[in-house]
Amino acid sequence: MFLGQYFEIFDWFIIYFTENNGMAFGLELGGELGKLILTLTRIFIVVFAIRYLFKLNLSKYKRPVLVCFGLILGGAIGNIVDCLLYGVLFNDSYNNIASLFPEEGGYSSMFFGKVVDMFYFPFFSTEIPSWVPYFGGNNFTFFKPVFNFADSCISVGAISLILFFRRDLNSVSYTHLRAHETSNH
């Protein structure tokens, strides 16, 4: 597919090929330094989270909680892999279809690749009434962001942890903290 090309599965489900240089909703830190900082920060957070999970006694967590952690970490690692490798392995998608292992090399170096997003769910569109300050008269589409499977994993895992397992996390974390404090004295 060409960058920006799309096809409809249903009116409310579109496969839309785009590349995201930043993070959620296309937010960027700006420039090459910003991209490098973003990629290194993602790697640091994932490594820290994995190390923290290994320090915990995971047997105290229910299996669904561990699945949520797995979704979050798996999604984060998937997006990191895109940032690290996509630009090295593929050529530019502007005005042509990206090819794997192009003779001239990829469009960027390690750490500077873009994340591929493709899922678009414009469930409904409406015009905001003109009397609404600032936004009045503008078109509003719900749900406008284009995202990928890794983003979905992160979102589902995080929302599930917050909605369904908040008490479990608080009690196990508190128990872990108390055990750690006791062992240090």
Model-derived features: positions:
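A short, hydrophobic C-terminal helix/tail in secreted or cell-surface proteins
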Residues: 179-185
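Alpha-helical transmembrane bundles and membrane-interface segments of multipass inner-membrane proteins
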Residues: 1-178
